Amino acid sequence: MDLALTPEQRAFREEVRAFLAASLSPKLRRGAALTSGVFAEPDIAREWQAILEAKGWLVYHWPDHAGGPGWTPVQRWIFEKECAEAGAPILPGMGLKLVGPVLYTYGTQAQKDHYLPRLRTAEHVWAQGFSEPGSGSDLASLRTRAVRDGDHYVVSGHKIWTTQAHHANRLFALVRTDPHVKPQQGISFLLIDMALPGVTVKPILSASGDHELNEVFLDEVRVPVSDRVGEEGQGWSIAKFLLENERGGSSFAPAILADLARLRTSMGPLTGELADRAVRLQLEAEALEMTELRTLIEIEHGAAPDPRSLTTKLLASEIRQGVEALAVDAFGLAGLQLPVERPFYGDAMPTPIGSPEAQVAAARYLNARAWSIFGGTSEIQLTLIAKAALGL
Amino acid sequence: MNLALSDEQAMVRDMVRRFLADRYDATTMAKGPMSPDDWRALGELGLFALLTPEQAGGLGGGAAEVMIVSEEMGRALAITPLAEAILLCGRAIAGSAAAEEWGDRLMQGDALLAFAPGGALVDGRLRGSAAIVRDGMDAAAFVVETEAGALMLVDGQDSGVRRTPVRLVDGSMAAHVRFDAVQAQPLTVPAGMWAEAQALAGLSIVAELVGAMASLLDLTVDYVRQRHQFGKPIASFQVVQHRCARMYTWLEQSRSLLLKAALAEEEARVRAVTAARAYIGDAALKLAEEAVQLHGGMGVTDELAIGRGLRRVLLLSRLHGGGIAARAALAA
């Protein structure tokens, strides 16, 4: 038993470190540090995506047959850890982490050839059309319907909580193609060009004042049948595959630990209850990092994922929320600034009182509440853990 | 990076697990301290020699072996003096004449050494008292850490040693020990060995806690499956499922910090053990409290391993200042 990196892994870490030191401009670092939502804003994200793609490391988590660099699970972890410590932007995951793996796993050759390269160059920017106003945790009850008409589906419905749909030009969506079978069996997975007639995006402003979320209305949108992924009725299995990637595809702890360390620097020395909370969060995050590593190391040595991997999204949500709450408390009244201008790193922002970290703290606190809701609520996660890990 | 046990480590784990499984089940776990005969039998199997450094005549097993053995002890809720007698005192005597006098007997399970913090040297004699000395009634000798921080060995036969029994919450026996001008032999612990001893004793305790957590969760999951109310197993209620799932997250997070501490490089070990103590004690007590709650009335009785497990976890989680002291050390 040991936790030491091999000489090859250490050399790889140095290579990643050197690349990050050379490639992450002050602008990108500042943009990442002052991001108030889950993902970097488009100006920051596009620039960083292009740098990674040029290096060949953008789709580091894809297998080599799909165009990835062929890294092992531990190499991927090293890369994520180094990116987090260097303060790299968090790229939107809808394309890279969600629909990308769906396409190389379930897509036809024509779909792979068309969509994967455009995803990588950011010619296509993806949004996720899963949730509906009446279908959140009970996703299988979704009602957006797709009626076959020759070589097309005619799609009508209403999607909600669509992150960054206002920046996207492609939507992957779950639609009901058969209303007469068990709900899970009547669902299909479609790729929708958002420029098609009948697609309307309406903003939803978050409590923080950020515009991350949207509603997407689909009104008799004609989608070619060739843009269905998998078989008709296979959408639910594909969605489960995708959600497993969303919850467990990469490590949460490195980013939390790095953010906590950066916050500790700008918060200064803490005493009393704040100091105790900071230590507890640090411990939880260190434990989570090891919980994630244990599973990665086992997979690296050929084992199947352990049910413990189901705990990480739940734990990461709570630790993340704890960190943002600590920041608000530690910054005092300065942590309650909530200017309406966006982004926080932009020129239009008023001069921060205290520090830029304090200025962004309240927005980050508010947005972090979504962690325990998106990608399966914490209550859904607990039910999954009880079933898969404990057999209840 | 590799988390698989070596063949030798797996053999040790299986040996300890089999030995304990023959003696402890849900009705006998944590009923009382391990019998001297069983303790001696473990000594004869070579377990204590494995965990003793070579300078003290042992086989020099490291942190991973301490973790593996202690976790099994915890899983059986066995009440033993492993951490203090073997890991702490066994290292305190390494390099001194005391190792020749006591080393073999300690490793064979024939004699116990107990750790007694307290007392001061006055005119070359030890005077004062140690308030609570775990396993102090049965100890053949004491490793004393004086108020000035010196390590000394005191023979339990010395006429100036006075012991008063103190029963602790887990049913183990401690002693209030007074030293009335007793002879104390200075221990010359090799450099770094005492810090190593404290780290390994701390590691052993958190490993026992993780083992105990795993058992208490297993027992609870079994119980909620068979316990029926309102015409169905209470395991079918979502509130019960979620509470069990929470217990599982505490167990896995605890095991992670335990592994990190056991596998830490030497220079990072003290910090990693402190981090494990800072988290695991509280997590284990929360889990034990939940186990009691989910067992209902039976959980608060002395009949089941659950109630007795709570008592054992309470003791282990509060040793050496518990999580409060460990978190304060990390915050400093």
Feature map (PLM): residue ranges:
Chain B
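The feature captures the short pre-catalytic strand/loop hairpin that immediately precedes
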Residues: 190-195
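Short, glycine- and charge-enriched coil/turn segments that flank and shape catalytic ligand pockets
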Residues: 96-101, 125, 185-189, 266-270
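Glycine-rich flavin
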Residues: 21-162, 331-332
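Flexible, small-/acidic-enriched active-site or ligand-binding loops
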Residues: 130-135, 156-186
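Alpha-helical interface subdomain recognition
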Residues: 1-76, 199-332
